[in-house]
Amino acid sequence: MNIMSSLTNAGRGVVNTVGGAAQGINSVKSSADRNIALTKNTGSTDSIDATRSSISKGDAKSAELDGTANEENGLLRETSMLAGFEDKKEALSNQIVASKIRNSVVQF
């Protein structure tokens, strides 16, 4: 290895080290900027605390409405099932009546 290639390699090492350090600093700065932006966009803790109560009440009301909807859906399914049974019962009754009529007709 001659002196020029040694100097070139050393120069590359210095450039790579400086470049890596600059990238690291830039990454730290970007992360800090991102965290600051997130904090600014979420509002102050006062605004969060002020809305927390109404959000909690809204969640409770939503859960109550979900429970009511589930009960109503259960009743609707039960009603539909009973209507289906009645429909089948009526169809069976009609078949029985039709069969009795066919059996009672005298063939000439």
UniProtKB/Swiss-Prot annotation:
**Looking at the record's lineage, which domain of life comes first?**
Bacteria
* Gene Ontology annotations for the cellular component aspect, listed alphabetically: extracellular region; pilus
Q: Where in the cell is it found?
A: Secreted; Fimbrium
The segments labelled Disordered in the record are: 41-72
What induces its synthesis? Answer: Expression enhanced by contact with host cell wall. Also regulated by HrpRS and HrpL.
Please list the residue ranges that the record marks as compositionally biased, kind Polar residues: 41-56
Give the consequence of mutating residue 4 to I. Answer: In strain: KZ2W
Q: Is the keyword RNA-binding in the record? A: no
- What are the entry keywords? Fimbrium, Secreted, Virulence
What's the family? Belongs to the HrpA type 1 family.
Described function: Major structural protein of the hrp pilus, which is a component of the type III secretion system (T3SS, Hrp secretion system) required for effector protein delivery, parasitism, and pathogenicity. The hrp pilus functions as a conduit for protein delivery into the host cell. Also, affects the expression of T3SS-associated genes. Required for full expression of genes that encode regulatory, secretion, and effector proteins of the T3SS. HrpA-mediated gene regulation apparently is through effect on the mRNA level of hrpR and hrpS.
Q: What name has this protein been given in UniProt? A: Hrp pili protein HrpA
**Which gene name does the record give?**
hrpA
